[in-house]
Amino acid sequence: MEEYRAYLELHRSRHQDTLYPLFFREYIYGLACGHGSILVESVGYNNKFSLLIVKRLITRMYQQTHFIIFANDSNKNPFRGYNNHFYSQIILEGFVVVVEIRFSLQLFISSLRELEIIKSYNNLRSIHSIFPFFEDKLIYLNLESDIRIPYPIHLEILVQILRYWIKDVSFFHLLRLFFSYYYNRNNLFTPKKWISTFFSKSNPSFFLFLYNLYVQEYESIFIFLRNKSSQLRLKYFRVFFERIFFYEKIEHLVEVSVKDCSYTFSFFKDTFIHYVRYQGKSILVSKNTPLFINKWKYYFIYLWQCHFDIWSRPGTIHINQLSRHSFHFLGYFLSIRLNFSVVRSQMLQNSFLIKIVMKKLDTIVPIISLIRSLAKAKFCNVFGHPISKPVWANLSDFDIIDRFLRICRNFYHYYNGSAKKKSLYQIRYILRLSCIKTLARKHKSTARTFLKRLGSEKLLEEFFTEEEDIFSLIFPIPKTSFTVQRLYRGRIWYLDILFRNDFVNHL
């Protein structure tokens, strides 16, 4: 229990208002907080979620020999104001929290046994530290393979995977009950609809758990195969549950076990191969010949077909030359750029021209995809022309400007790793004009008239502030310093970014 309290303390800043009860051990309740995510919207249940209602429901479950709430012919509601689907949602959310505890606490339990909590907390790293890893390693590699994790997987296989580390028979009965209930209710688990159900808005935690369970199983086998081909020491980064809370840098030999947890980012490092997984996609990069990486390609295909009964065509895994193709990763387009330079060398009376080729990781901002994301959020149209934000017109002027400024700063903060920042100027232009049009809409005037009336007021001064000035606020160096200008033109990877940009999630 002390370990669990420590977990709550570390995540208190990310807590939600929803309380999840654990009802598998008599009447002892544990409350799990900190399950907030930028990927998953919180479910409010129409503000009717009550711990008292849950307690009454648990008591009723202990007294009954069957689940009345799952009966198809039962439309009666034993409690006022709540329907049967509400009961199923409560039980399902509690069920997911129970099975996720083993995953979410594994890192902290292992840290508490060997280290202090504070020391473990200080080892947290930013998402942006992944890109310096790429800068150091990708320039020496030549092949990249994009792997799309295939769906669907049979539900009974998921149950068999869980049997390795859960021995409670009633647990599997309850799991099959959920499968049967949601299959009959919405027919969710048909192959055509399986992909969308993994991140269903109605039950995101449940489907995220199933997805990570499946990926954890195949990656543990992949680690085993990789260790058979190399005995070198491994370094890898890890993140919980596709939710991008944080990740911790670990340096140790990986122990392959079916009990290993599923992580979003995993780097298996040796001289020849690197592996990265994020969302539903994996990247495999290598310095070896195409025959070698093609061998790994068929390893994955046979693994999915023989172990998980998933049919995956070879065309779903693409092998590309890094020097000729770019790939998408966490909101960036990454590619290897060749810089050519000519050096003149003279030896005695003879002179030579030496052509030098240097490789450099090129990080490009996907401006078209970002404009598409801004269009979905109603900041502009599909052509990139700014429009007003009507839903914010009822806010105060300060709140409207503050929201636009926060979005603009987040863009610059997240994409400062790109050496070509001209694309960000277009994003700033869209947000600035959208802010002006929203303010003009609120005051019932045109954008031109509103700007003229604004006159000498400095309401939008921060939007017109040069990026060098903002950068100088971050680094206390004189504005005229050549160091500031040089740093600004180069890449800046911030080590305080624990979440992806909200607009990156739509790319």
Curated annotation (Swiss-Prot):
Entry annotated with the keyword RNA-binding: yes
Compartments where found: Plastid, Chloroplast
Gene Ontology biological-process annotations: mRNA processing; RNA splicing; tRNA processing
Pfam families: Intron_maturas2, MatK_N
The keyword NAD belongs to this UniProt entry's keyword annotation: no
Cellular component terms per the entry's GO annotation: chloroplast
Alphabetized GO MF terms: RNA binding
InterPro entries reported in the protein's UniProt record: Domain_X, Maturase_MatK, Maturase_MatK_N
Record key words, sorted: Chloroplast, mRNA processing, Plastid, RNA-binding, tRNA processing
Family in the record: Belongs to the intron maturase 2 family. MatK subfamily.
Functional summary from the UniProt entry: Usually encoded in the trnK tRNA gene intron. Probably assists in splicing its own and other chloroplast group II introns.
Name this polypeptide is given: Maturase K
Species of provenance: Amphicarpaea bracteata (American hog peanut)
Gene behind the chain: matK
